[in-house]
């Protein structure tokens, strides 16, 4: 796999969970002998939802809810077959979305 690069994007609502997952990925990759760039924190996506508090009237009384999506980027340079195998067996928490591009 010479000259290849694996790009991993992580998304989660909780920043502690995503940081812990990124740390585990970096530790696993460095143990197998590949080079790692990252984790790079990407901009946090913030969605704000405005909801009327009353079910019928009082339109002036509203409540705001927000949902933040934290993102991290990890690049693995010159991965070995052992690196790919260990990444496939890595067990990460349920709240983390992982996108892998070769």
Swiss-Prot record:
Keywords: Ribonucleoprotein, Ribosomal protein. One of its GO terms (molecular function) is tRNA binding. This is Small ribosomal subunit protein uS10. It comes from Thermobifida fusca (strain YX). NCBIfam families: PRK00596.1, rpsJ_bact. The keyword Magnesium does not apply. Coiled coil: none annotated. GO terms for cellular component: ribonucleoprotein complex; ribosome. Pfam families: Ribosomal_S10 (PF00338). GO terms for biological process: translation. PANTHER family: 30S RIBOSOMAL PROTEIN S10 FAMILY MEMBER. Involved in the binding of tRNA to the ribosomes. Part of the 30S ribosomal subunit. The keyword Ligase does not apply. Belongs to the universal ribosomal protein uS10 family. SMART domains: Ribosomal_S10 (SM01403).
